[in-house]
Regions:
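Non-catalytic, C-terminal membrane-associated alpha-helical segments of glycosyltransferases
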Residues: 49-54, 74-122
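Amphipathic alpha-helices of TPR/Sel1-like and other helical repeat/solenoid scaffolds
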Residues: 56-63, 87
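Short, solvent-exposed, charged loop/turn and helix-capping segments
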Residues: 65-72
């Protein structure tokens, strides 16, 4: 799985856990095992706008992995579409038209891929 991707300015833990969970069995423990301490000034989400940009990068990177099962590939595409929509909504709110157009094009392409696969047009 490698280590944290140091090329990502943020969400490198998200990227790592995506890769780990894609290829290893992970189980749910219904018990609090840590105390989350968020919202402080040093938090990267305070430093970078649109944190989902880095999550989109991580999901796109995962899609390039040839070892991803068909089911997990489709689920990754669905999550990528969801994250793109979050960014599109934020971009519209902030009037980032070029950003929105680029992401909307990518989202539409992924929706077509999923639709074609559902309809057997691969």
């Amino acid at each position: 799985f490698g280590f944290f991707d140091e090329n990502l300015p943020a969400c490198e833990d998200y990227d790592f856990w995506l890769r780990f969970c894609a290829f290893e069995d992970v189980h749910f423990v219904n018990e609090n095992l840590l105390i989350k301490n968020g919202g402080h000034d040093q938090q990267l989400s305070k430093k970078h706008w649109g944190m989902d940009r880095f999550r989109v990068t991580a999901l796109e990177k995962l899609l390039k992995d040839q070892g991803l099962s068909e089911f997990k590939r489709k689920e990754t595409i669905k999550e990528l579409i969801f994250k793109l929509q979050v960014l599109i909504d934020g971009g519209r709110k902030r009037k980032k038209d070029a950003f929105v157009k680029k992401l909307d094009k990518k989202k539409t392409m992924l929706e077509v891929i999923l639709s074609n696969e559902r309809n057997g047009k691969v």
